[in-house]
Amino acid sequence: KGLFESNAIEIIEITKLGEENGDKTVAVDSFEDNNLVFIDEGHRGSSGDKWKINRDKLSENGFAFEYSATFAQAINAAGTKKKELENEYTKAIIFDYSYKYFYNDGYGKDYSILNLSEDSDEIKQTYLTASLLSFYQQMKIYESSKGMIKPYLIEKPLMVFVGSSVNAVRTESKKQVSDVVDVLLFIDEFIKSKSESIANIDKIMSFDSGLQTTKGVDIFENKFSFLETTKLNASQLFDDMLNLIFNASNGTLHIENLKGVDGEIALRIGENEYFGVINVGDSDKLVKICEANGMSIASRDFSSSLFKTINDTTSNLNILVGSKKFSEGW
C-alpha cells in the first residue's frame, strides 16, 4: 500500500542477468542507472568475471554496498589483479568486521580441518566413523539442552557432505565412483558391518584410532568429552547412532530416485523414515553408479520436494549431500 501500491516487485536470479535481453536473460542495461545495489558474499566474482562486470554496471551511477568476511583472503588469491583490487577496496571500507572479529564475537562456526596423509579404505572408514560420531555428539548435546538453547534459536544439527560437483566421476578398480558414492558406501558399510563399526568406535573413543598428529597424539583426543559423560560403551553408542541419525535399529541402506521431483535422491534404512537426501543435477546417472557399486536402488513416485522439508521442525532428515553451494546455506 501507499508508495508502492501500483508497482509490482519483480524478483530474478542473478544468473539471468546478461548483456542482451533474451528468453531467459535480462539485459543489465534494462535497469535504470540510479541503482542501490546490495551484494552479499561480495568476494565472489571480485577477480573480474562476468558477475563482477554486471554488478559494476548496475551501480555505475548509483551506489553499491558489499558484504564479505573474507575480502582480504580473496584479494590475496587474486594473482595479477591483487594490486588493482587493493586500490579499489581499501579506499571504500566503511566498517572492518572481517572473519576474526565476528568469530571472536561468537558469530562464526567452530571448525576442525584434519588433513590425512593417506586415504586407504581402512583409514577412510575410521575417519568417516569419527565424523559421524562427532555429528552424533552434536545431536546428543542438542537433545539434552533444548530448553537451555531455545532462546538462542539454535536449529537441530544437520550433517552436510559437499563437493565441487555431486556427479564428478572417477574410475577405481575398473568401477565408476565419486565422492558421493564414497559417502554412501561408507554409510552402507557402517550399518551392515556392525562388529567392525563397533570396533572402530571403540578405538576412536579410546584415542587409539591409529591416526596421529606430528607430535604422536591421537587426532581425536579430547574431541568427544560429552559422549564420555554418557558412560555408553561402543556397542551402545552404535545402537543409539542408528536410532538417532538413521531412524533405524538395523537394516540395509536403500537409495531411492524420487520421480516427479527434479534431482533428488532419498536415503533410508529398510522401510524406516528417510534420514537423508541427495540434491543432484542428474539423479539418474548417480543412481546407476550406485547400482554398479552393488547398492540397493529403487525409484519411487514423489509429488513434492523432500529437500524443501529439511528445515521443518518435524523433519527426520539428518544428512544432506550436495554441491558446495550448500556450504553457505539455502
Segment roles from a protein language model:
Residues K1-I9, S144-L320:
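Conserved C-terminal RecA-like helicase domain
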Residues L3-N21:
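Mechanochemical coupling/switch segment within NTP-driven translocation systems
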